Amino acid sequence: WQMALKMFSIAQHYVCAIVVSSCHQLAATSCFTRKKTMSKQTISVFGLGSMGFGVACSALAAGHHVYGFDVNIASQDRFLAKGGDRAEIAEAGAVSDVVVSVVLNGAQTTDILFGETGIVPHMRPGSVVISCATVAPDLARELAAKCNAFQVLYLDAPISGGSVKAAEGALTMMASGSADAFAAAQPALDAITQTVYRLGDVAGPGSAMKAVNQLLAGVHIAAMGEALTFGISQGVDAARIVEVISKCAGTSWMFENRAPHVVDGDYTPHSAINIWLKDLGIVLDVAKGSHFSAPLAAAALQQFIAAAGQGLGGEDDAAVAKVYAKNAGLTLPKAK
């Protein structure tokens, strides 16, 4: 019995040591996965497009009171049919704990926050803006300072995951801002994200990280179009290219996600060509400002510009493959 007790004591010691070590490791990381909270908030979501609609519906599904805003009245009506709410901006601002901006760019973000009918002047002190658009880090810092003048908190919080993850409330967020901003936004973050990377206590790093992601994503999509059409030019079936390369070292998430769109001849815009003119433009502007050469990003941007010039700007970004196909005199698969 003494031996058994001794063995139990040793095992207990090691279990405690492992638990303590694990807790220290978790405390040291700045990546937080979603934990559902019971706190319910009033949330205003601006931009009910492919991403914003999913964000708004995820917040609604979590039990929050959600106002939806979009220049497209049909999108607002669609959200109302899901159980969302609509109000005048001043009214929504006065009662909102959180404002989530999921609009296209920095100009739209600035307008919905501080324009003629901007919402920030109507928000209560201590409420928070979660700004999800891809913008330059300098603009993120400027918007945070303007919010601070109204005693409104600001999270520089670009998102990734596409419309599917948005609808599932499982986005990845690259966020930076004060501890108070994170705390004020937490119930909303629990509803719309799977993982939140906390990248600093001021605005800017979140947008800088998103620029890194967009550089890679844009280059990978352009590379997908080039590789797939190159294979077709050599007489290889497009579907077989996707099947084989997806299991090889040369694959990428973007190849596996976008190449099937080309194989199916389906260019329904989940993420449009025009998005990349903006996002890679931001990447190159930021790079230029820091005297950093980004030739791959520049080359990818030229392909997206060419696609837009061919009238493909509103199509899915996989349509960049059409630029390569046209130059090579190839015919891509047609929609089934």
Regions found by a protein language model. Give the residues of each.
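Rossmann-fold dinucleotide-binding core
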Residues: 134-214, 218
